[in-house]
């Protein structure tokens, strides 16, 4: 018997668009800022993974087309929208989504890059926009306060209350200065209140010690947790791509290196005031599969638990700071970092190479929130292992 029939798997064509063959149509990163005239697409899941949106930017003859689709995880199409008219003046690089519970409303957050407008030296060539889409049409809200430059914004629906959280910079060069909060009307998208919270001294000490004139850059939104009293805890990661040379038997070739560095975790009150912000020093670089790099995070009540691969022991830095270093190695050590409701940090080694002999895909666990379990997959070649971690008052020893 074929194993797929044993699980009752079936195939269904969701979308079909006439074009030249595209070898890897989902390979375009949602953070890619290059806009060509070819075929590009991106897929975005909502927070509880109950739905996913697909954007498709392509050409039909001489015309550029931009289509947006929303599907439930049962693969039923909930929305189909032609966004083509909006890309005549702007290119959109969407980053995050939120959906209504009935999946009839889609909120898309991202950068809108102006195509023809002229800019002075103090302006950026893009602005953040939130786009609300229903079958009846769309509406847009821009975030463009003078002297404030939002970054990595994320829309969230909390009991039908629409908010957006992220970071902001005082200059256009993406040197982040703090946390941004916007409360919005979920129907009109009008901004009802907003707050800009500068990074705290604690956060800057975490990241830089006593270094002066240091900067926070390249933060990409990662995850969000709503506490029982509706406080907002969100995390982001310092992520960027560099290019380098690699030599092999065929000569020199240019390769891309993907950097997953420091983790930022911050807590805002339900009204948008910052309670704390912490920085966790980390450095990782990979040339390929990101599953073994980065981190995963699990919110439990008022506490946050972060899981990362790291070397045998974190490196000690100045001012009682530590650095978690390159995680993907032949020694699969997994550390758990706990941040409590006051922002206090603690950590311990959760898994070492005596328990699990294969590298763990630490950034892609299966999360069962109903039972407070995380299931991690470990793999090298044809060898595989599974690791289960249970979250209670504190993480227990993993059972395999």
Task: Locate the predicted segments by residue.
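Short, conserved, GDST-rich strand-edge loop motifs in beta-rich repeat architectures
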Residues: 50-64, 111-124, 167-179, 237-259, ...
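Conserved blade-ending motifs and adjacent loop-strand segments that build the rim/top face
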Residues: 140-154, 191-218, 273-295, 330-335, ...
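Long, internal scaffold/assembly segments composed of regular secondary structure
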Residues: 98-111, 116-236
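Blade-level signature of beta-propeller repeat domains, shared across WD40, Kelch, NHL, RCC1
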Residues: 367-400
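Beta-propeller blade signature
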Residues: 1-4, 10, 65-76, 121-138, ...
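Post-signal peptide N-terminal segment of secreted/secretory-pathway proteins
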Residues: 1-30, 34-44, 56, 65-67
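C-terminal structural cap/anchor segments
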Residues: 247-248, 267-323, 332-334
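Structural signature of eukaryotic scaffold interfaces centered on beta-propeller domains
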Residues: 28-51, 95-105, 154-160, 172, ...
